[in-house]
Amino acid sequence: GSPLMRPQWFFDVRQEGEGIVDVTTHLVDLVQWQAFPEQALSPSDAKVLSARRWSTTLTPAQFEQVTGASSFPDYLQRDVRNGNLEVYSNGEFTYRLRDVHARISVIWNFEAPPGTGDTHFSTMRGSKASLTIRQGEQEKYRPVLYIQRAANVDAVAHEKAVRHAIASLQKKYPGIDVRRATTEEKADWVVTIPERLSVGHEAHFAQVTENFLRYLREGNMPEWEVPNMLTKYATIMQAYEMSRKGE
């Protein structure tokens, strides 16, 4: 297909922002929602432990392919090395949110492998099980949720707990189920989600917009929204500042 065209300033991190402060806004949201759902957090609850950033290299030909420009503009010359443009679109950091440790990583390559697009990988490790979302070739690049019991948990008790949890979710999400994983899937269980509930990444933006418009109509929002937003951006700025130290 045709490449997604971008304005030239899209590759200026001073205007567009670096990767470590871009997509990470959504990922930090996910950590907060999953680890502390509907709980008010404070910036003092978050401490970044390590952070780094690195660049993706764009050749002049690649830049022209996605912008239509035959050369790098003057305002990007400070990011040109050996004739190529270095874009700090990648970053990762580890941090502690209250008593939960989390790692956030964003990688932007110029082009995804054929047949793929944006992909997401996530693991939540608990004392009794791990929940992992994989979106690789085996999953046909669609997100799939796996459940893996912890080594010290009895298999029978684990199955009972999994089936009880799925049964409770079925009340809100009819059709959701679980099946035993295959050897290749390297897990105990696979959560199966019907097509009508598997709405995809883009539909999530509409859902967020619907929530915002509802808050606007009602003239209020949950008490945790504002403090958690402040905590999110404070966390990201800690990571941004730490990633630049020593450069």
Report residues per predicted region:
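Predominantly a Rossmann-like dinucleotide-binding segment in NAD(P)-dependent oxidoreductases
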Residues: 1-84, 212, 246
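Glycine-rich, charged/polar anion/phosphate-binding loops
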Residues: 77-79, 106-110
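C-terminal helical cap and adjacent loop that interface with cofactors, partners, or active-site loops
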Residues: 15-44, 88-95, 99-103, 110-247
